[in-house]
């Protein structure tokens, strides 16, 4: 040993570490440290058997689980590759392995990796990233804390399977392959993403890779290259090729098991997985108080050298590496009781390994030595090859840590070549405790590589380094849950809650908080859960996960942001009994502050503050209240300070300025208490004099109002919109009454004496005198005065006199503070200034307003929640122990190369033709392939109005390729003798993930050859998309193009601008199709472009005319259109649909020039053109003549069925439990109206009435007034609501309607449903017509009426209310109508109470809710899925069918569909005789089936029976019924009449019931109801139709639950047919007849119960209906439409503040113009906004009441205020609406004439009157709609 080492050995660990670093910097090493112990402090792993971490791995080992399984089908076909003969070509001798699930899943977003890069990354790299992160979390080392540190990464990798997979798809290889698959990138990426500065080394020594990596990591630590090391390895089996090769060696077990050391050993079975360990020097780990799992005492590596073969093991080398490791570890072999062997289970390898083990660890048997067990984890999970070493290492670490040796599987007797009799070695066949030993437990791990590299590691039990538990448990714990997004925070909270309820139930809460706060990464988003105990913590975490508010939960959006804190001290009014009691008991800093203040308090005030708080009695009298409040405020300030929260400025409100002065240092506590005591004592003399009132008026309005009351003065400037007045009680009450008439808030403020008023004047001289000797100091913290405008007041006697007398300038002070400060904390026992603060500060979210206590909530929990919101968690200051929390939950997505089998097939065949079959007759040919976007992802870059569409160029290439292939041209050769004529796209082909395509080449009898291209519908029908004629011509190749001698000159157009223009017309060309690199527009009406095939477009030798090239050439025709003549609009686009001829002369290559000519620029329905493609040599490569571009409307673009079908599904959504007193008390304070049916003539009604009565008794409280009425008594309802709305102290908050079922008979239910709907419209009229404040929320309550599960019949009467809910969401969104279905078998009112208490929380609300037991379900609109595999025939040949509403447009479409499908008899019901047009249709159908018309109203008795009887006449087999009868009469709920409701209700709902009853004895295949999208999506003006449709929906559910066939389709509007065309608007496009028939076929075949079918306009839904953002039902739609529905960059009303009046008016006008254009369906805004003037009434543009409602709702979303619907309908113009909004926003309009609201309304009324007079003179006949 060197002298340096000897001296260094005497140093402390810290000193030795510092010396070692210096030596490393000097270029030398530290020789004694090669033996330094290394601590294992963390483990991450994923192994077969669903092992996701050390706990699950140990459980697998302890249970002796064998994880080997047959090769999963997503890897390869095990049977196809299997052959027991090792010599079989291309086959393997095994079907088995150990596999990790979901190897294609990765959380790329978490690591900031793009999807494109993630696809190119080897999954081994991906899993290594995630497991490395998990290992650091297990170690308690926040990964982000390692950035910039000397942390090393050493990982073993040897497999290249994913590289092989990528090479198979060489056409799609991109730049990311170079960093996605090399092994060096795996470690480099970890170092890069975590910012690690230590060595990053990838190790490939085959099977020993990961153990060698661990050895290198230990060496690096000892040499001080690194301070922390991540070491391990990964192996995934993605390709069969390695297994095939190993089979040729006979290395793999034919039985699929590793029988280590056993006589049955026949080879190994491959496994896969990943393991990572976190290593530190033991001294560092002890210093850092890390949890040490085990210690690496020594390790060694060597090579076999020359042996019997390169892959043959060498016993001597294995013995040497073991000996070296033991020597370096300085331990004897007999101290090792367990060896984790290489143990592959091969006939050759096992005996050789045992020989080396016997020569080292085996000696000593019979000499009292303890035995040594041999194990191999390969018997559990297979041979993990590159990860095998780390798997065994982790097993050894866990074994020594837990003192238990797991059993070895598949061992019965020793391999005959092994003699263990003379050794201490044995194979444990049962798990057993570790043998007793004098020293620490020790184990060893061996790993031997195929190429000869060996590694051996000695592992030892960790020394006792446990951190002592904290001395005392905190009263509360703060759990910080962090994530990169709010969604990740929610999922982390859910996982943690589940863990704390299950595996982690025994973990102390303080340790959980400590681990979260100190040992986890802090991401951009974090939330905090404050809890006293485990149950509270779990409930808080679940609330956080569900997005529900709860006491003690601070979500991601509640944390204060920005610099600058202001402590705000309130005036009188925040006191309450028992304030501060919990804080005295729980918070030492608060108790200390009170105790230190108490002697001063007693001396100045005369009684004990401390005793007052302990007693908890109510403090009475102004002379006691004010001093106690100041004492409380000073103690609360010290509480904040004890956690490091210090104010940067202070503000006091009235008496609160005393506390502010003390905190700022201007007064001492003694002086402050003297001031408040003197002040309050003098005020007590005036007790009972004067009154004060809070007014919802700004200062100017308040001054103007009280000008007539000389004794009333302005006392407080509370906020920009609120003031407080003071004066004689009678005058104050008069002012209150005057304000109340304006529907504004006005109420008394409870005070002993009216301060800040002349009433105070008599005591002011004495106050000045008593405080004359006060000597204030300059404040150390800025005071922002509410008494004077001076920046820093002098807190002398004059100041305190003015403080009591002057008006409180609170909002001015807050406004001034808000310039430089972001967080305002109210210091008081209860928040009383919150509203004033939030009302004053800007609402853009840059300021945070908080409080300190809340009298209705747990004081300690509430304070710590506020503390967390500031960014401080109390438990961050406490100690604790690291616990094994669940790791970060990954948000996995699938990343994988394109399907390999498809790629292999495409490599051999044309990409768009596919498999070829030559027909036996006529020389016809057929090709079949899949052109879906999953198989051909590049085609997804060709979109029309957002939908991937097969380009016409693609069809043209298919025709060319088919003709060339069938006519004998080589697959990769151009065929100049082939001409395509009369090419036509008959119907666009929408592309889905998988889109099968069939191409047919037909030789006609006239020697003509045709190509036809088909897809197949879900109903099995072929749909022809394109046709072409093929001609074989001897035409010679064209040569040089006369105009192609050089680039043309003209007007250059930017390709980016050109593509942007195309996007405006609905054409989107993604990277694969954006091929134009140069565009020059020429004067002769042509354009020359340069085309380069993008890298994203695939290459293939089979292309004759690459679709991307031809598509770009067709784009060039559009580029030839002159400036100003846009080829299309937002609602229509010009698309190529036919070509006269296509000729290809020579190979195009990747680059070509194009000359495009416009031959006809007619702006009508189409344009004509031709193109010439010129190669680089100047030769013509191809020509296309007679190109026709047709104008295609947006609604004509087909969509796949999956994009048109919707469902309303139930989702469990728990509500956060609310402790009493509830936090939502403020949201329920006010007046409530409870309505129920007073008649109890049915059990359901009696139940509802009883529930209503119980609710009234429970809900009444001092803060809630409850009124009642009979729901069916209209006058009583109106009177009750007038009474509810008449109490200004308790404004209306909610209307609760209890709805009961009529009886078990459906006909009674039908009438009850209709009557209930009508009665609820009365409630709406009462609210909308008589109340002008914030609308109360409407609650509809039923008991078990909704069908949540499929087997629940429900009651149609209750379910019909869903239609009303959906419509009111748009007509009156402010009412937030909600249907709650309670479980009457449980405690329904508890659930209802929870709903009402939580109603005010969150930005979204649930509108249809069902409780089942304690489980809460909500309805969500979702995309539906369809499975047509059931495949039963939809229409039976020759059978009979009935269609109600059969003579309507939709009925006749259904009739034709039935006849086309083979129906024998179709009975059509109708109310009138057929028209001539209908007779013509019927006559045509009659030629193919028997058509019978039955006249009558299906809602009338006997008509339905007649329809069924007719269908069954003469032995007809009735197999299906379609109920399509309908009448629509648009009407807003507010104005709907009872007759209107009945006319709509009868055919849809009553008719459905009649058809249900009439078919009771029929054996039907299906009973289909045609319902409306209005009941699924909602539609303003469609309340009656929506409710009737919802009743039909529920009847279908009732039938299914009763075992009867039934289905319903909620149709959106059809084009040209159906009475529901009124629903067409800017949100729903019409369904074509073909689309409707496809849906009808598919949905009946799939046997779905309920499905909505509609073409939802993704680009306009949020524009037309901004209110859906606040409705949780539409969450999925909102997420889909957020980007598409944007109306541009609108900053909200705040964006107008900095504009001058003229600019503000223009901004408002432009925004309203965009809104109106979207609602009314104008694509050209100039229709709405002509140049000048802007006073054309909107009603003259076609505006109706429904549009007016939507314009109002849009204005509310944009500006926060709304124009009245009546104003819009009275003839208002865009100019008028702008003026009204400017007035409401408080912006001065530059046109003074428009500032008066009466002027605006008068002008609109005059226009309306003139139009009405003209209309009466014309007297048109009323329109009648029929069904």
From Swiss-Prot:
Cofactor binding comment, as recorded: Binds 1 phosphopantetheine covalently.
GO biological process: Actinobacterium-type cell wall biogenesis; DIM/DIP cell wall layer assembly; fatty acid biosynthetic process; phenolic phthiocerol biosynthetic process; phthiocerol biosynthetic process
Residues annotated as domain PKS/mFAS DH: 910-1198
MF (Gene Ontology): 3-oxoacyl-[acyl-carrier-protein] synthase activity; fatty acid synthase activity; oxidoreductase activity; phosphopantetheine binding
O-(pantetheine 4'-phosphoryl)serine: modified positions: 1745
Residues annotated as domain Carrier: 1706-1785
Region named Acyltransferase: 566-876
Active site per the UniProt annotation: 207, 342, 383, 654, 942, 1111
Descriptive protein name: Phenolphthiocerol/phthiocerol polyketide synthase subunit C
Organism name: Mycobacterium bovis (strain ATCC BAA-935 / AF2122/97)
């Amino acid at each position: 040993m060197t002298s340096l080492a000897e001296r260094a050995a005497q140093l402390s660990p810290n000193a030795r570490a510092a010396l070692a670093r210096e030596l490393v910097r000097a270029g030398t090493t530290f020789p004694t440290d090669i033996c330094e112990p290394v601590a294992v402090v963390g483990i991450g792993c994923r192994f077969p058997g669903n092992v996701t971490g050390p706990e699950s791995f140990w459980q697998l080992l302890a249970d002796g689980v064998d994880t080997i399984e047959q090769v999963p089908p997503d890897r390869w076909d095990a049977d196809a590759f299997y052959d027991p003969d090792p010599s079989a070509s291309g086959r393997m001798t095994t079907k088995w392995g150990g596999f990790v699930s979901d190897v294609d899943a990765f959380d790329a977003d978490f690591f900031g990796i793009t999807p494109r890069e993630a696809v190119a990354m080897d999954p081994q790299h991906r899993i290594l990233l995630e497991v490395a992160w998990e290992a650091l979390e297990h170690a308690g080392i926040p990964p982000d804390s390692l950035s910039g540190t000397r942390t090393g990464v050493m990982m073993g990798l040897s497999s290249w399977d994913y590289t092989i997979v990528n090479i198979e798809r060489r056409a799609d290889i991109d730049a990311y392959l170079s960093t996605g698959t090399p092994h060096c990138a795996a470690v480099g990426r970890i170092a890069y993403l975590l910012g690690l500065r230590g060595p990053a080394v990838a190790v490939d020594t085959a099977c020993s890779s990961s153990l060698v990596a661990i050895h290198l990591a230990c060496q690096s630590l000892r040499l001080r290259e690194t301070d922390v090391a991540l070491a391990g390895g990964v192996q995934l089996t993605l390709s069969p090729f390695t297994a095939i090769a190993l089979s040729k060696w006979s290395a793999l077990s034919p039985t699929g098991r590793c029988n280590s050391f056993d006589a049955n050993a026949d080879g190994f079975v491959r496994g896969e997985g990943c393991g990572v360990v976190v290593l530190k020097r033991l001294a560092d780990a002890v210093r850092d108080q890390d949890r040490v799992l085990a210690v690496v005492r020594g390790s060694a590596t060597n090579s076999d050298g020359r042996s019997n073969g390169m892959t043959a093991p060498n016993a001597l080398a294995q013995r040497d590496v073991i000996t070296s490791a033991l020597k370096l570890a300085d331990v004897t072999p007999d101290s090792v009781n367990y060896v984790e062997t290489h143990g592959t289970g091969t006939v050759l390898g096992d005996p050789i390994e045992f020989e080396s083990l016997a020569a080292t660890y085996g000696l000593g048997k019979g000499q009292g030595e303890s035995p040594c067990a041999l194990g191999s984890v390969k018997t559990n999970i297979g041979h993990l090859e590159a990860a095998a070493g780390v798997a065994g290492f982790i097993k050894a670490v866990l074994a020594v840590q837990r003192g238990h040796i797991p059993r070895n599987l598949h061992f019965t007797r020793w391999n005959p070549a092994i003699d263990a009799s003379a050794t201490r070695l044995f194979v444990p066949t049962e798990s057993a405790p570790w043998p007793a030993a004098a020293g620490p437990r020790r184990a060893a791990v061996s790993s031997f590589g195929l190429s000869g590299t060996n590694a051996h590691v000695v592992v030892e039990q960790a020394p006792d380094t446990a951190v002592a538990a904290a001395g005392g448990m905190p009263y509360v714990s703060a759990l910080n849950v962090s994530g990169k997004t709010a969604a990740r925070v929610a999922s982390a909270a859910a996982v943690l809650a589940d863990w704390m309820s299950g595996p982690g139930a025994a973990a102390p809460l303080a340790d959980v908080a400590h681990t979260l706060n100190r040992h986890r990464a802090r991401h951009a988003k974090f939330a905090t859960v404050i809890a006293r105990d485990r149950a509270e913590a779990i409930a808080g975490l679940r609330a956080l996960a569900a997005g529900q508010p709860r006491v003690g939960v601070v979500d991601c959006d509640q944390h204060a942001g920005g610099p600058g804190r202001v402590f705000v001290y309130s005036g009188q009014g925040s006191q309450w009994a028992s304030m501060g009691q919990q804080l005295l008991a729980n918070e030492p800093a608060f108790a200390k502050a009170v105790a230190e203040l108490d002697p001063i308090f007693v001396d100045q005030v005369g009684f004990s503050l401390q005793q007052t708080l302990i007693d908890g009695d109510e403090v009475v009298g102004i002379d006691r209240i004010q001093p106690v409040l100041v004492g409380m405020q000073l103690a609360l300030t010290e509480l904040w300070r004890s956690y490091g929260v210090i104010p940067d400025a202070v503000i006091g409100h009235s008496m609160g300025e005393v506390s502010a002065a003390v905190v700022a240092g201007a007064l001492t506590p003694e002086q402050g208490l003297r001031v408040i005591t003197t002040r309050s004592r003098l005020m007590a003399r005036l007790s009972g004099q004067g009154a004060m009132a809070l007014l919802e008026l700004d200062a100017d309005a308040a001054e103007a109002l009280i000008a007539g009351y000389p004794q009333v003065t302005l006392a407080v400037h509370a906020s920009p919109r609120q003031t407080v007045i003071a004066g004689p009680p009678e005058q104050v009450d008069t002012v209150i009454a005057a304000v109340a008439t304006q529907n504004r808030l006005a109420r008394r403020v409870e005070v002993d004496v009216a301060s800040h008023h002349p009433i105070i004047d008599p005591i002011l001289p004495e106050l000045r005198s008593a405080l004359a000797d006060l000597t204030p100091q300059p404040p150390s913290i800025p005071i922002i005065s509410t008494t004077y405008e001076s920046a820093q007041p002098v807190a002398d006697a004059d100041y305190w006199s003015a403080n009591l007398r002057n008006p409180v300038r609170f909002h001015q002070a807050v406004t001034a503070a808000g310039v430089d400060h972001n967080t305002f904390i109210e210091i008081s026992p209860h928040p009383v200034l919150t509203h004033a603060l939030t009302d004053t500060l800007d609402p853009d979210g840059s300021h945070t307003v908080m409080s300190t206590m809340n009298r209705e909530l747990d004081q300690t929990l509430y304070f710590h929640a506020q503390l967390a919101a500031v960014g401080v968690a109390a438990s961050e200051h406490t100690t604790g122990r690291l616990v094994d929390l669940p790791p970060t939950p990954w948000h996995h997505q699938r990343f994988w190369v394109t399907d390999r089998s498809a790629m292999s097939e495409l490599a051999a065949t044309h990409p768009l033709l596919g498999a070829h079959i030559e027909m036996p007759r006529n020389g016809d040919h057929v090709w079949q392939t899949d052109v879906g976007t999953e198989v051909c992802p590049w085609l997804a870059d060709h979109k029309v109005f957002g939908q991937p569409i097969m380009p016409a160029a693609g069809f043209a290439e298919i025709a060319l390729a088919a003709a060339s292939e069938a006519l004998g041209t080589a697959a990769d050769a151009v065929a100049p003798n082939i001409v395509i004529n009369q090419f036509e796209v008959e119907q666009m082909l929408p592309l889905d993930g998988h889109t099968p395509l069939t191409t047919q080449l037909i030789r006609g009898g006239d020697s003509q050859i045709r190509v036809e291209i088909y897809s197949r519908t879900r109903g099995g029908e072929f749909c022809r998309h394109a046709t072409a004629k093929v001609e074989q011509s001897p035409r010679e190749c064209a040569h040089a193009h006369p105009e192609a001698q050089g680039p043309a000159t003209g007007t250059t157009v930017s390709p980016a601008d050109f593509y942007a223009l195309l996007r405006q017309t609905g054409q989107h060309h993604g990277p694969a199709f954006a091929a134009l690199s140069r565009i020059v527009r020429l004067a002769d009406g042509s354009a020359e472009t340069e085309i380069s095939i993008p890298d994203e477009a695939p290459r293939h030798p089979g292309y004759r005319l690459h679709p991307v090239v031809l598509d770009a050439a067709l784009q060039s025709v559009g580029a030839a259109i002159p400036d100003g003549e846009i080829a299309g609009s937002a609602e229509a686009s010009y698309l190529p649909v036919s070509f006269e001829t296509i000729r290809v002369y020579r190979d195009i290559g990747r680059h070509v020039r194009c000359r495009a000519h416009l031959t006809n620029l007619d702006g009508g329905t189409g344009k004509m053109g031709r193109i010439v493609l010129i190669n680089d040599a100047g030769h013509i490569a191809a020509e296309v003549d007679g190109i026709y571009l047709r104008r295609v409307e947006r609604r004509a673009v087909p969509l796949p069925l999956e994009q048109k079908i919707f469902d309303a599904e139930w989702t469990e959504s728990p509500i956060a439990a609310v402790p009493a007193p509830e936090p939502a008390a403020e949201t329920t304070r006010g007046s409530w109206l409870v309505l129920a049916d007073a008649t109890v003539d049915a059990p359901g009604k009696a139940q509802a009435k009883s529930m209503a009565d119980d609710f009234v008794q429970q809900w009444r409280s001092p803060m809630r007034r409850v009124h009642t009425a009979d729901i069916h008594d209209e006058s009583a309802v109106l009177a009750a609501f007038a009474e509810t709305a008449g109490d200004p102290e308790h404004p209306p908050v909610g209307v609760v309607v209890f709805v009961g079922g009529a009886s078990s008979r459906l006909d009674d239910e039908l009438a009850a449903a209709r009557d209930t709907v009508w009665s609820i419209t009365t409630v709406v009229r009462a609210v909308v017509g008589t109340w002008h404040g914030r609308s109360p929320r409407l609650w509809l309550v039923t008991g078990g009426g909704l069908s949540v599960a499929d087997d629940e019949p429900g009651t149609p009467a209750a379910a019909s209310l869903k239609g009303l809910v959906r419509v009111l969401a748009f007509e009156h969104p402010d009412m937030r109508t909600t249907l709650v279905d309670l479980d009457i078998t449980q405690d329904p009112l508890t659930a209802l109470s929870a709903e009402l208490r939580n109603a005010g929380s969150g930005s979204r609300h649930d509108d249809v809710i069902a409780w089942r037991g304690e489980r809460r379900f909500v309805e969500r609109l979702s995309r539906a899925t369809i499975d047509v595999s059931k495949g039963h025939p939809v229409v039976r040949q020759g059978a009979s069918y009935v269609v109600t509403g059969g003579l309507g447009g939709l009925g006749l479409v259904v009739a034709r569909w039935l006849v086309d499908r083979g129906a024998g008899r179709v009975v059509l019901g109708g109310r009138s005789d057929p028209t001539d047009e209908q007779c013509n249709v019927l006559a045509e159908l009659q030629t193919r089936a028997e058509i019978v018309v039955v006249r009558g109203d299906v809602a009338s008795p006997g008509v339905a029976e007649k329809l069924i009887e007719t269908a069954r006449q003469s032995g007809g087999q009735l197999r299906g019924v379609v109920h399509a009868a309908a009448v629509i009469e648009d009407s807003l709920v507010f104005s709907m009449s009872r007759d209107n409701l009945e006319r709509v209700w009868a055919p849809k709902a009553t008719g459905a019931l009649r058809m249900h009853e009439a078919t009771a004895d029929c054996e039907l295949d299906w009973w289909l109801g045609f319902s409306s999208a209005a009941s699924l999506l909602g539609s303003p003006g469609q309340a009656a139709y929506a409710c009737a449709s919802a009743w039909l929906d529920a009847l279908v559910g009732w039938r299914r639950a009763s075992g009867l066939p039934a289905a319903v389709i909620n149709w959106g509007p059809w084009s040209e047919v159906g009475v529901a065309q009124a629903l067409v608007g800017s949100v729903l496009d019409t369904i074509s007849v073909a689309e409707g028939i496809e849906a009808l076929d598919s949905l009946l075949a799939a046997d779905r119960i309920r499905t909505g079918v509609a073409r939802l306009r993704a680009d306009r839904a949020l524009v037309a209906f901004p209110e859906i953002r606040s409705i949780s039902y539409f969450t999925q739609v909102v997420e889909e439409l957020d980007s598409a529905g944007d109306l541009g960059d609108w900053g909200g009303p705040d964006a107008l503040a900095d504009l001058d009046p003229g600019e503000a008016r223009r901004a408002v006008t432009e925004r309203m113009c965009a809104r109106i254009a979207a609602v009314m369906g104008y694509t050209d805004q100039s229709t709405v906004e002509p140049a000048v003037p802007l006073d054309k009434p909107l009603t003259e543009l076609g505006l109706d009441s429904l549009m007016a409602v939507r314009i109002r709702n849009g204005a509310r979303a944009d500006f926060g205020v709304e124009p009245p619907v009546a104003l819009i309908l009275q003839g208002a113009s865009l100019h008028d609406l702008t003026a009204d909004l400017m007035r409401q926003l408080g912006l001065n309009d530059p046109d003074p004439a428009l500032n008066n609201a009466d002027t605006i309304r008068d002008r609109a009324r005059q226009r309306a009157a003139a139009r009405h007079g003209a209309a009466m003179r014309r007297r048109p006949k009323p329109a009648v709609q029929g069904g």
